[in-house]
Amino acid sequence: MVFNLENEKDKKVLALSNFLIDNNILDHNELNSLIERIESIYFNKYIEEKVFLFAITISRPLTIDIWNALYEGFNELNEGFKADNESFKLTITFKENEPFFKSKNSFSSVTIAIIKDYFHSFFSKDKKYKILIEQELSNPNFLSYENDELKAQCQTKELTEWLVQKSKSFIFWMNNAGFKNFNFIALYPIDKNESKLKVKAVTVSQYDKQFETKVFATEFIPIHKINQQIDDVKIIGQIFELKTHESLTGKKTLNIYVTDFQLGGSLILKWSYTDEKKIEGITIGNWIKAHIQVERDPNTQILYGIVREINPVEIPNNYKRLDLSKQKRVELVFHTKMTAFDGINDIEEYAQFAKERGWKAITVTDKDNIHIYPKFYEVAKKYDLKAIYGLEFNLTDDHIKIVHNPDNTKLSDATFVIFDIETTGLHGRYDDVIEFSARKIKNNSEIDHQQFFLKIDKPIPKTITEITKITDEMLEGGIDQQQGLEKIRNYLDDCVMVAHNGINFDLPFLQTQFEKYNIKPLTNPLIDTLCLSWALNPLFSSHTLSNICSKLKLEFDDERLHRAEYDTEALKKVFFYFKKQLKEMGINTLTEIDQNLNKKCQIDLMKRVFTNTAIVYVKNQRGFQNLYEMLSIALTDHNANRPLVLASSLAKFRKSFLLTENPVQGDIFKAALTKPINELEKAIEKVDFVLISQPNAYLGYTLREGLKKELINDAIKLVIKTATKLKKLVAVASDAYFIHPWENEYYKAIVCAKGLGGKWHRHFNNKEKEQTVPEVFLHTTDEMLKRMSFLGEDIAYKLVVENTNKIVKLLDLNELVPTKNKLYPPVMQDSNQKLIDKTWKQAEKRYGKNLPKLIKERIEKELNAIISNGFGIVFWISHLLVEQSVKDGYFVGPRGSIGSSLIANLIGISEINPLAAHYLCEQCHYFEVSDSVDDGYDLMIRDCPKCHEKASFKGDGHNIPFATFMGFSGDKIPDIDLNFSSEYQAKAHDYVRKLFGVNNTFRAGTIATVAEKTAYGYARNYFEIIKRVDLATTAEIERFKQKLIGIKRTTGQHPGGIMIFPSDHSVYEFTPCGFPADDVESEWKTTHFEYDALGDAILKLDILGQDDPTMLKHLADLTKINPQNIPHFDKNLISMFSSNKPLNLKPGIVDEVTGAVGIPEFGTKFVRKILEQTKPKDFADLIRVSGLSHGKNVWADNAQKLIKSNRLTLRDVIACRDDIMLYLINKGMQAKDAFEIMEKVRKGIKVNAKEVSLMQNCGVEQYWINACLKINYLFPKAHAAAYVLMAWRIAWFKLYHPLSYYACLLSFKLKEHDINGFEKGYEFIKNRLDELNKLYRIKKIKPKEAELLTSYEVYLEMMARNIKLQQISIQNSNARMFVEHNGVLIAPFITIPGMGEAVASSIVEARNEKPFASLNDFKKRTKITKKHVETMEQLQLFDEFEHQDDHKLFN
């Protein structure tokens, strides 16, 4: 055989051939015979590869080294085959006439030596037993062979049991090596009471039957087919999750979650490794092939794999989904995961899929929203794709028909014909009428009645017989279709028709049948009682005939339902009732029904109306603003349980769009099934082009409505024929809701999940617990051409490829940008000048008229950056807000980096002074910078060295660079977050609206998506619904969960974000708007785009609500002390953060060593542990602790280790982002370089080699550089300082005004209370605290228990400080505040379990009017319930009343 040495595969075959010859396994003749016999034997569907057969016969003993070399050789050869997407299977046979292969009685000494090698090779792989095995093998009597039994005489029971456990795998391994028909026995010395451990090997014949002799078979078993323990198997799959576990000994196990994307096809592979290099290539998203052993977890009974070998591999061909067409199609309908409860994929996945297949453009058509547009723009740009911006929406006429063809006929004069038809299905074009029933009414009396059956030429569908009880036998005496339909037409003519759902079903069905039999259509009026009921009975949840009768108390027999004869009888009663209602409303004619009810009941009608699913595409840049306005109107003015676009609204903006319909749910395809040709033509005339989909996209019609697949094809052809006749372009779209066909299962999981408001998905039948999901994945060009081949090759190509590309050319895609990228600040007259004047005025007021150079230069630098970049308005608005809040008596706590600005400090936005530590005299303004401390609050109060005023020389300044707030060049948009009291937040929001107007102020919109726990629930629910809980393994649930996370559920609003739009621009230039969660009762509208998408263009104010400013306000009210007058320097207060000694606690009550319990930002267990370990010495250290506790990878495995191991202090480690910039500048680095390194590190971006070198050249210690490399996020120092200042003030009240402090802490910070428990005393509280701490440590504590844990800690501290807490007092308790009474704190009414604030307030309001005279009086004048009373009686709260006859309030 001639080998091509340029071919890698041939080279490997040659190398293996030489190996076989060199080791006397085969001779030349045998080898040639082998190679000539290589042939393609079958095609493996799972991995889509050709599989070649190798067969060799071995006729001599092979030592273990040759055996292993043979194994490795064939694995190498396999790699060569894999490179060509091929595989091979090796079959080895052994000559059985040699003693080595088939023992009679015993083996030779040479054979025994080889067996020992095999034994050692197999069993010594386990490190735990390797030494024991080697020791045993040194004993010549350890292994013996006689009578077809290989015996291992062990010295320990443990080893014996382990050998027994592994025996099956060993025997199989030895069978494949040629040792046949022998048993393996493991023995050890036993007592009389013990029995010998013995495992009989499965005989070779059984093994041959199960495994044949495929030692090196490289076929892969699909993961979803693994359903039992297997000793040796190979799989291929994609990694979707990695989790590393490290033991106490440092051994690392990587849990690799892999899947083959089939239902139940996920498995966790456990791989123990020591070398980090081994896991290269083992990353999420990569495909791997693995050689594993499948075991079953004894606890969960779930299968998992133990990795023997694992390697990255190319994606198998059947998962590649290549698009090989020279010209690609363009997808025109795709829904991302922003289509609520209906889309699966993120836009990035979609773009990547398109790019990999050579597509040039992609489309998004999410339903009822365009949240994805900003990200779509960025992603399309990233992948160099043209973005087609679409929107799918519910389209309806402005006027909702109640009467078809209304005229001025008076209801009192009309002759009505109430009718109903029974049919073989829902589709007038393909189904038939089988029963007709009608009753003629005149002057409220029935004057005639008709009922008859119509013959059909095929059996009645089984489902129709089940519903209507009409059988084939009943039709035998019926009229033929032509005669019957003519009779129906004549009977209905010249009367006012009345039918339930007549406009949408009965009349179109009949008109289509009339067309089919050349019968003249009906033109007379029809009253639809379904639509009429929508208007007259808006509160009915259902408007079926049976439910209407039930609600109106009209006699109705459910058993006789769905027969035309009985339905008309019931409908007559309903119509008479409705007629009476219409008369009472003053409605007397058919026209008045239609017009008056549309005016009065438009929203109620909109909630129920059957809509058309339309799609528009933005044609040009102007189209965005028009689309945003049209969508906003739908989301606000016409939001009737769903956003509706009215026809008039669409017409107003029509020129900016291309209009079509959803190919499956639109009116065009429905008309092809159910309406006459003229109605189909009307539908097609309305659109710019027609979309159809591939037949399997319409499977919902088959599964739900019984429409046969061949009729779907016929309807598609009818649409094409009619559109072509009308000269409308027709194109094919996937109508996709996910990308890959195997993602269908994820989609089904969402279909089975109950949506918001308890609504079920359109593809889910909750009654039957069945899904009717069509094939709606994203098709490649090749796939779509194949699906549409029933049209013929030329037509299919035209519709799939040519026409989709023609449509793209109708759009101007080159300049489309959905959002603006420059700032459009709101305008407020003279705001810049007011800011400048206020700044200098305040600077002079504080520092004197002759400002120090340091301060003057800082102000000038900041003002220049703020004003020149158009940010003055931001500062001025913030100033007005804070000023108003302070006027109203509420302090404001800033957060974020605003404290980096001196101007913010001067005009009152921030209390954080960013200057370096300095002294300032309150009297003479003498200013002096101090380098003796890191923070100005650590400067002791002194007498002024200049004017000698006592205690007037005070420290300030936290040394924070301005660059950390607005960037090195001062051009970063300032993000000013203000923490208002939660009691004042709403007033602050309203104040902004008052300043700028309702039409210019919006809440920042958010998108609520499926969270992790919800996704887990959806996944579990799906497996339960399909009754395959056995497949719901940990790995499989994880796979589903990951895909379901992030799917849109609804919209929301930022807790404090207010977007201010410029008054000289329309909001629609920037974004659509709507209501949070579509709540039309909401006081605020929200932006449709999230803040991040608008941040470069629109000013956002973060007006947040927090309890800390509320608490501070009430502390000030209780103590009459202004928090701003609390001293900056206080050694006792500093000490309290790391020690409880300043609190003077009674010994033996509190275990906590710090005094930080209940202090905001410092009271959590995590931060208290940091305080305990670091022991902060000053205010600067407290800021560092705050930074460490809020950063990511800053404390744990970083600063914590440095402080513990290197004996460093808080001052030596990186705690806040500003530390980096200040430290590097101090080391001599240029400010810009220091800033850029700081920006990288704070965002978790690794500094590069050049920047590391720059730090090293400046003398930066290596531990400091290493710390930078670990950090993922760094907290701003200004933010930390603001938190610490708030904590400092509250801590001061805790230390010096404990009763007021605990009253406010219990009122505003502790969410759960156990007043009864407090009264039970120390032992009870301590025991409960210990129980909850145990749950906390093992991470099994519930949220409510976690809140109680904090409360119990506070209770113990109160006991240790001798502060008493008393149960609720009807005469003295407040509604929601703990109040001081005679030196004791009294609990409020709201702490009564189950009592809300409204009920609690009603008690106080009634008591304030006059004291309660009795229990009965208490009951009458408050909002308490029976349950409340029972609880209050259990708490003995009524004991302060005298026992009267009315003691029992509810008898």
From Swiss-Prot:
Top-tier EC class: transferase
InterPro entries reported in the protein's UniProt record: DNA_pol3_alpha_NTPase_dom (IPR011708), DNA_pol3_finger (IPR040982), DnaE2/DnaE/PolC (IPR004805), DNAPol_HHH (IPR029460), DnaQ (IPR006054), Exonuclease_RNaseT/DNA_pol3 (IPR013520), NA-bd_OB-fold (IPR012340), PHP_dom (IPR004013)
Name of the protein: DNA polymerase III PolC-type
NCBIfam families reported for this sequence: dnaq, polC_Gram_pos, PRK00448.1
Catalytic activity reported: DNA(n) + a 2'-deoxyribonucleoside 5'-triphosphate = DNA(n+1) + diphosphate
One Pfam family it belongs to: DNA_pol3_finger
Role of this protein: Required for replicative DNA synthesis. This DNA polymerase also exhibits 3' to 5' exonuclease activity.
Domain Exonuclease residue range list: 416-575
Origin species: Mycoplasma genitalium (strain ATCC 33530 / DSM 19775 / NCTC 10195 / G37) (Mycoplasmoides genitalium)
